[in-house]
Design a protein with these regions (language model features):
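Nucleotide-sugar donor-binding/catalytic module of glycosyltransferases
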Residues: 1-168
Length: 168
């Protein structure tokens, strides 16, 4: 579906969204503003919510794009709902969406290798719902991960671009 949408939409920028997640009202505007810096593709940060949609925390440990996940400095990730891609780029890279669980990881690995000019909005505008599928991590994953990242970056998270520390 994600690969096909590149050919079905009539827009300059394509945002993606899984059926169990949602976006903040300022998501698209923050994406568009970040694209004005000349990027091929952009990503936002995400909030973590329980299965009923209640806020748990900001994700400062997994879906960080330029920065590795907390448990392995060799693994990088961006959640599907955080991606926004210029349509012309999406058409050329769309084949990288495989359609199975983990497709966002496979897609991210492909796009970051082929299109190295990308940026982060620095805003938590995507909302990820825990327990959306059987492979979903639990809230303890984020509690542990955020605590470790707070120790790793005591002077502020670099993905925020403002060198500020978010309390977890």
């Amino acid at each position: 579906m994600y690969a096909a949408c590149s050919f079905l939409v009539n827009a300059d920028i394509i945002c993606y969204l899984d059926e169990d997640n949602w976006l903040q009202p300022n998501h698209v505007q923050s994406i568009v503003d970040t694209f004005k810096r000349g990027y091929d593709w952009v990503y936002s940060l995400r909030n973590i919510n329980d299965k009923d949609g209640n806020f748990i925390c900001e994700d400062n440990c997994e879906s960080l794009g330029h920065w590795p996940v907390y448990f392995n400095d060799g693994i990088f990730h961006i959640d599907t709902a955080c991606f926004a891609i210029r349509r012309d780029v999406a058409i050329r890279i769309g084949h990288a969406w495989y359609g199975q669980w983990g497709a966002d990881r496979q897609f991210f690995n492909a796009i970051k290798q082929q299109y190295k000019n990308y940026g982060c909005t620095g805003e938590y505008t995507a909302n990820y719902r825990l327990d959306g599928n059987p492979n979903s991590v639990k809230k303890e994953f984020f509690a542990e991960g955020n605590a470790k990242m707070k120790q790793k970056y005591p002077n502020g998270y670099p993905w925020l671009g403002k060198n500020k520390l978010v309390e977890v």
